[in-house]
Amino acid sequence: MVQRCLVVALLVVVVAAALCSAQLNFTPNWGTGKRDAGDYGDPYSFLYRLIQAEARKMSGCSN
């Protein structure tokens, strides 16, 4: 039983490491880049407010 748990844990670690591997390349010539974070501010704030509203609704139901 312990050996099986160890094998499963090792398998999970290997799969997680394989999914997390990436290559990063940095260059000083990128400047500001093509995508500015300011363009995505409104959808993110909308999602944040939506999640807050749903959390308030759910907390009201638990009473």
Swiss-Prot record:
GO terms for molecular function: hormone activity. The modification Pyrrolidone carboxylic acid is found at Q23. It is found in: Secreted. The modification Threonine amide is found at T32. InterPro entries: Adipokinetic_hormone_CS, AKH/RPCH_hormone. Keywords: Amidation, Cleavage on pair of basic residues, Disulfide bond, Flight, Hormone, Neuropeptide, Pyrrolidone carboxylic acid, Secreted, Signal. GO terms for cellular component: extracellular region. Its main location: secreted. Residues 1-22 form the signal peptide. One of its GO terms (biological process) is neuropeptide signaling pathway. Pfam families: Adipokin_hormo. It comes from the Eukaryota. Belongs to the AKH/HRTH/RPCH family. Adipokinetic hormone precursor-related peptide (APRP) can form three type of disulfide-bond dimers: p1 (alpha-alpha), p2 (alpha-beta), and p3 (beta-beta). This hormone, released from cells in the corpora cardiaca, causes release of diglycerides from the fat body and stimulation of muscles to use these diglycerides as an energy source during energy-demanding processes. This is Adipokinetic prohormone type 1.
